[in-house]
Amino acid sequence: MPRVKRGVTARARHKKVLELAKGFRGRRKNVYRIAKQAVMKAGQYAYRDRRNRKRVFRRLWIARINAASRSHGITYSRFIAGIKKAAIDIDRKMLAELAVNDPAAFGSIVEKVKAQLA
């Protein structure tokens, strides 16, 4: 049975890891053993934060809607309750966009909500 030499496959594997570690600081970018650990940890952070991103953005939208609705004299919780009651089917992402980029449209929604709650 012939001897198997792993030079080509090892080189390819090392190259793949070192390319993923591009931009890292210190020896994490050019020492395979350290780069491999750094890439693994980066992957764990990426996996975790893809899930956290959804929470973070929802919190941001809620903060923006709350600020805009309070400037119109209504709290966030009453505003959301009024939207549900008025059967306005618009999500928090779009409400936050309106609050930031089109305050007049957001104001008209607030007026409809206030009328529904009164």
From Swiss-Prot:
Q: Which SUPFAM superfamilies match?
A: Ribosomal protein L20
Cellular component annotations (GO), alphabetically ordered: ribonucleoprotein complex; ribosome
Q: Does the keyword RNA-binding apply?
A: yes
- Enumerate the InterPro entries for this protein: Ribosomal_bL20, RIBOSOMAL_L20_CS, Ribosomal_protein_bL20_C
* Protein keywords: Ribonucleoprotein, Ribosomal protein, RNA-binding, rRNA-binding
What Gene3D superfamilies does the record point to?
Answer: 6.10.160.10, Ribosomal protein L20
Is Cell membrane included in the keywords of this UniProt record? no
- Similarity comment: family membership: Belongs to the bacterial ribosomal protein bL20 family.
Primary role: Binds directly to 23S ribosomal RNA and is necessary for the in vitro assembly process of the 50S ribosomal subunit. It is not involved in the protein synthesizing functions of that subunit.
**Protein name per Swiss-Prot or TrEMBL:** Large ribosomal subunit protein bL20
Protein source organism: Methylibium petroleiphilum (strain ATCC BAA-1232 / LMG 22953 / PM1)
**Taxonomic placement:** Bacteria, Pseudomonadati, Pseudomonadota, Betaproteobacteria, Burkholderiales
